[in-house]
């Protein structure tokens, strides 16, 4: 039995010899051959029968027939082992093939996983995009929903006028929705060679003053489409505002500009400008003036240096510093100022933060709350990380409401009689205020509507009570509408922007304007605003770059002054000692009214 077992081991090794590669298996086969020669012969015979190395199958078959019963029994055992050897080889091949298949499947699975992840991400992104699109569509639909029934009806009002029971027909008609919805461009007033930054009607509404980047001021007879006079403002950089002083016989214009100067122009009855003189100087750009409704000689100015000047033309030194706007001992540059028409002691300012500040000239104490009477801000912007600036604010006709336009945000209406920190009352959406210091205004004798320009080049008019967009007009081919000035008595609107002309609008269309393309424009404005809000970090980089450039300019400026033979040039007393470069440095990187021509 032991020899049979040995022969079996030997046959198995020989049968697998071609597959074996380990030295231990080969040495075990040699030891089996040294143990018994008979077994070695049998093993060799079996190897011949397995491999066929003896030359042919006949010899193998003859020897197998001449053996005894024991050998035949051994042959049976050897045959069974031979068959076992064949099965083990096939099994190993199958295992090897299976392992290769598994490896290939694993590799395919590994290759497939990133593809599946990308597909899942794409599907999630598509899902998010579709959700955002649906949300945007719902938001746009809510902003352009059906309007409520108008309060003023044309036919009943005309009938009442015929019967003499409506003494204020024109007054009420100017504030009617039906007229606003029929606004159409009447004509343009061409005379400037730069962006038009300011518009202002005189008290009677017969003249319209405009100021531009070309440093000129033009007074228009807007009905005849002709300039009454035009003159050099005396400013050294972009003219931001030019206003007729009330009750002055249209003979005095107050102006302010990017160079920080506040100047006054004296107009003669012979339709010429006698002279202009400087009455105040800010250390930064001055964007807005605030007139007192009945005063021909006093007004306020605000600048990016955070200073508010009160200017009285009757004084030898007209300007006196009224207040420096601060937030926790930090100065807040100002873009806008407006006097309350119902209480001229109060005025509101806005600028490089999110707060509307109201002051009372009789109660300004900078040691107590920095002199502020009260502040308003939309509550979601109080602690917001996004830098919200107020580009323009205005009081309503009776001073009870205050409208503020925020850059890359919406327009908010506050009740001016509410207590400090009160929430807004109304919110007006759809436009975009980012590229320039954009204006906002009330329209109508009772401030029935809100009107604003937009970076998309359109003019938006909202009904104040419902917050719905009721008019939508293309107002500027250059792309941005900055200034909107309602006529004091008629249903007429003057607008200007990056284009070099002034546009006059009146309700002369035969039917209400179709708000074609409004939804697409609103969607585009919303997407652009959302995209910009994701890149707030870039704002810090731009501020840092501006700071470095500002520092280098200052060093270069001081170095030039230290050079021998370089000194200040004599300047006219009416001119500003600061150059436009200095104005640029003071102004900072946040907002500009319009790029210089």
Swiss-Prot record:
Each WD repeat occupies one of these ranges, namely 191-230, 234-275, 281-321, 329-369, 385-424, 432-472, 476-515
What the entry lists under Pfam families is as follows: WD40 (PF00400)
Q: What is the effect of changing residue 362 to A?
A: Reduces association with DDB1
Q: Where is the composition biased (Acidic residues)?
A: 100-112
Provide ranges: composition bias, Polar residues. 1-24
Q: Is-annotated flag, keyword Nucleus?
A: yes
Give the matching SMART domains: WD40 (SM00320)
Which ranges belong to the motif Nuclear export signal? Answer: 39-50
- Where do we find the motif Nuclear localization signal here? 114-122
Ranges of Basic and acidic residues compositional bias?
65-99, 124-137
Name the GO cellular-component terms.
Answer: Cul4-RING E3 ubiquitin ligase complex; cytoplasm; cytosol; mitochondrion; nucleoplasm; nucleus
One GO term of the biological process aspect:
protein ubiquitination
- Where does it mainly reside? nucleus
Query: Main role?
Result: May function as a substrate receptor for CUL4-DDB1 E3 ubiquitin-protein ligase complex.
What family does the entry list?
Answer: Belongs to the WD repeat DCAF8 family.
Associated disease:
Giant axonal neuropathy 2, autosomal dominant: An autosomal dominant peripheral axonal neuropathy characterized by onset of distal sensory impairment with lower extremity muscle weakness and atrophy after the second decade. Clinical features include foot deformities apparent in childhood, and cardiomyopathy in severely affected individuals. Sural nerve biopsy shows giant axonal swelling with neurofilament accumulation.
Q: What is this protein called?
A: DDB1- and CUL4-associated factor 8
**Organism lineage:** Eukaryota, Metazoa, Chordata, Craniata, Vertebrata
């Amino acid at each position: 039995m032991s020899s049979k077992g040995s022969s079996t081991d030997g046959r198995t090794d020989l049968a697998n010899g071609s597959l074996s590669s380990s030295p231990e298996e080969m040495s075990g086969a040699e030891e089996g051959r040294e143990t018994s020669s008979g077994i070695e012969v049998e093993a060799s015979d079996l190897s011949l029968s397995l491999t066929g190395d003896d030359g042919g199958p006949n010899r193998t078959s003859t020897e197998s027939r001449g053996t005894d019963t024991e050998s035949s029994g051994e042959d049976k055992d050897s045959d069974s082992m031979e068959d076992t050897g064949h099965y083990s080889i096939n099994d190993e091949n199958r295992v090897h093939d299976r392992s290769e298949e598994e490896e290939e499947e694993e590799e395919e699975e590994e290759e497939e996983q990133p593809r599946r992840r990308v597909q899942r991400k794409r599907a999630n992104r598509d899902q998010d995009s579709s959700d955002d699109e649906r949300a945007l569509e719902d938001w746009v639909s809510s902003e352009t929903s059906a309007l409520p029934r108008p309060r003023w009806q044309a036919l009943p009002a005309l009938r009442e006028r015929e019967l003499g029971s409506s003494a204020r027909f024109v007054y009420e008609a100017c504030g009617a929705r039906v007229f606003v919805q029929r606004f159409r461009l009447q004509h343009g007033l061409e005379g400037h060679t730069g962006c038009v930054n300011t518009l202002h009607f005189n008290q009677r509404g017969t003249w319209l003053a405009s100021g531009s980047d070309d440093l000129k001021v033009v007074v228009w007879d807007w009905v005849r489409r002709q300039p009454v006079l035009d003159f050099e403002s005396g400013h050294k950089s972009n003219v931001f505002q030019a206003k007729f002083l009330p009750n002055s016989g249209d003979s005095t214009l107050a102006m302010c500009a990017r160079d920080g100067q506040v100047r006054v122009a004296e107009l003669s009855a012979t339709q010429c400008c006698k002279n202009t003189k400087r009455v105040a100087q800010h250390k930064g750009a001055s964007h807005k003036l605030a007139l007192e409704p009945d005063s021909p000689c006093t007004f306020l100015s605000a600048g990016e240096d955070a200073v508010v000047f009160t200017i009285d033309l009757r004084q030898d030194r007209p300007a006196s510093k009224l207040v420096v706007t601060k937030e926790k001992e930090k100065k807040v540059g100002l873009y806008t100022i407006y006097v309350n028409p119902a209480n001229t002691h109060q005025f509101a300012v806005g600028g490089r933060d999110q707060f509307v500040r109201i002051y009372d000239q009789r109660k300004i104490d900078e040691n107590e709350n920095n002199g502020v009477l009260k502040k308003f801000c939309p509550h979601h912007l109080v602690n917001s990380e996004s830098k919200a600036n107020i580009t323009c604010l205005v009081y309503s006709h009776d001073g009870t409401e205050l409208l503020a336009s925020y850059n890359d945000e919406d327009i908010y209406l506050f009740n001016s009689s509410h207590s400090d920190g009160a929430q807004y009352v109304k919110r007006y959406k759809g436009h975009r205020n980012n590229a320039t210091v954009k204006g906002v205004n009330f329209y109508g004798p009772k401030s029935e509507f809100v009107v604003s320009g937009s970076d998309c080049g359109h003019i938006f008019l909202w009904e104040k009570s419902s917050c719905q967009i009721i008019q939508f007009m293309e107002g500027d081919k250059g792309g941005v509408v900055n200034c909107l000035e309602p006529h004091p008595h008629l249903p007429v609107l003057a607008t200007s922007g990056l284009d070099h002309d002034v546009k006059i609008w009146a309700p002369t269309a035969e039917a209400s304007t179709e708000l074609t393309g409004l939804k697409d424009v609103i969607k585009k404005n919303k997407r652009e605003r959302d995209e910009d809000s994701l890149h707030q970090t870039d704002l810090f980089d731009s501020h840092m770059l501006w700071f470095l450039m500002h520092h280098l300019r200052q060093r270069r400026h001081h170095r030039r002054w230290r050079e021998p033979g370089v000194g200040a040039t004599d300047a006219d007393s009416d001119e500003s000692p600061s150059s436009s470069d200095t104005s640029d440095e003071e102004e900072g990187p946040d907002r500009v009214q319009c790029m210089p021509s």
